[in-house]
UniProtKB/Swiss-Prot annotation:
Topology with respect to the bilayer: Peripheral membrane protein
Disruption phenotype: Malformation of photoreceptor synapses, followed by photoreceptor degeneration.
Tissue: Retina specific. Detected in the outer plexiform layer in photoreceptor cells (at protein level).
Keywords: Cell membrane, Cytoplasm, Membrane, Phagocytosis, Secreted, Sensory transduction, Synapse, Vision
Official protein name in the record: Tubby-related protein 1
Main location class: cytoplasm
Function, in words: Required for normal development of photoreceptor synapses. Required for normal photoreceptor function and for long-term survival of photoreceptor cells. Interacts with cytoskeleton proteins and may play a role in protein transport in photoreceptor cells. Binds lipids, especially phosphatidylinositol 3-phosphate, phosphatidylinositol 4-phosphate, phosphatidylinositol 5-phosphate, phosphatidylinositol 3,4-bisphosphate, phosphatidylinositol 4,5-bisphosphate, phosphatidylinositol 3,4,5-bisphosphate, phosphatidylserine and phosphatidic acid (in vitro).
Organism: Mus musculus (Mouse)
Pfam families referenced in this protein's UniProt entry, alphabetically: Tub
Composition bias type Basic residues, residue spans: 267-276
GO cellular component: axon terminus; cell projection; cytosol; extracellular region; photoreceptor inner segment; photoreceptor outer segment; plasma membrane; synapse
Amino acid sequence: MPLQEETLREVWASDSGHEEDCLSPEPPLRPKQRPAQGQKLRKKKPETPDSLESKPRKAGAGRRKHEEPPADSAEPRAAQTVYAKFLRDPEAKKRDPRENFLVARAPDLGGEENSEEDSDDDDNDDDEEEEEKKEGKKEKSSLPPKKAPKEREKKAKALGPRGDVGSPDAPRKPLRTKKKEVGEGTKLRKAKKKGPGETDKDPAGSPAALRKEFPAAMFLVGEGGAAEKGVKKKGPPKGSEEEKKEEEEEVEEEVASAVMKNSNQKGRAKGKGKKKVKEERASSPPVEVGEPREFVLQPAPQGRAVRCRLTRDKKGMDRGMYPSYFLHLDTEKKVFLLAGRKRKRSKTANYLISSDPTNLSRGGENFIGKLRSNLLGNRFTVFDNGQNPQRGGGGDVGSLRQELAAVVYETNVLGFRGPRRMTVIIPGMNSDNERVPIRPRNASDGLLVRWQNKTLESLIELHNKPPIWNEDSGSYTLNFQGRVTQASVKNFQIVHADDPDYIVLQFGRVAEDAFTLDYRYPLCALQAFAIALSSFDGKLACE
């Protein structure tokens, strides 16, 4: 038994010496141990006395070492310690402390990167200690994260604005406010620009509103022509209320006087449309005596439409090529107004218009006017029965013929099928409800030449109302208020650009040789009849 006791003492001595080595806090003994195969040594930072003092603070470190069973060799223990540090350090480095502190990431700013990295290293060391404390105590403490943001805010204030999105002192903030200010400025500018437009569209005081209320005002022109027009147009922008009131009063007086004067001596009669025409014609002398000549030259009564019916006569030897046309009032009595026929021996289309259906010659007493076209047949001029200035009629200006209207059909060179486009030029009306006389002494002073040169002094330009395509019927349609029943290329409506709802002239087919013709102020029967005749003539370049 003495051998066994000696061996036990040796074992006890070896065990006690090993325990003393494990309990000793001297670090230089650990680097001498070799790690296991497949693992690399981790370079250790030189430990300062602060780190040595901080090691005893780690709670539970000695207990874990006592609880672990003794290893057979020193190499496995060294591997375990190195492996533990290898696992612990990456976990701390992988975790971003900014996630706990909710600090926004600032853009890269060159010289400030070093200071930020140093602060991140300090945070990593603090996080390692916090994790170890959490493992030992198994409790989560939220106090350190609350203190850290305050410190960061102090540092950020000391360093100055970095352009952080979350910081209130970011330099981008004033740029955004500037943009908003610019936007507000543009809005104000737009409002300022819209200001004068809104004043121009004033429904109460603008001349356009008065023209819509009184359609006759659209056709009023002064004796001075464009000069007076220019003065009237320049008045509203000045902004003086007195001038506006004066203009309104003048327009109202002119319209009122025109209504009173343009009553055809029966303006007090009650009724509308056809009834008025009937009463006027019934109280007038018989048609054959010569009273129709005055009626067909007078403008239509204001506020009423004169409804007529136009018939075409193709019977006879030459009526197929040169038919005759007759205009009657569309009433029960069918009062005759005008007749027209195309002349045979003429280089261009030439229609003679008379107030006697039995005598359609130029030398007749009832000859009242004519319609003449150019060589292409797309431009027409309406004359009264005055003398031609080129044939010895230049002595007395009052005896020269007047140009009552001009019609221009837009050429269709490419041959596309579609509705016609018309432009009608007529003389304007003065304050006495009389037509401004246009008596050109040469060919360069007519309505068509003035229209081409855009010198529309004392003139009114009208256009046909564009029809609307109807997919159901597969044709172009216009609202004729039931006055037109058949489709035709000759159907049209003439309107003014200022008021497209005010139909000055309406023409359309109701039978093979019957058409309706309704006209309103400022047209007269002769003008309306001649414009309708121009649609019958063949047009080489318009169809």
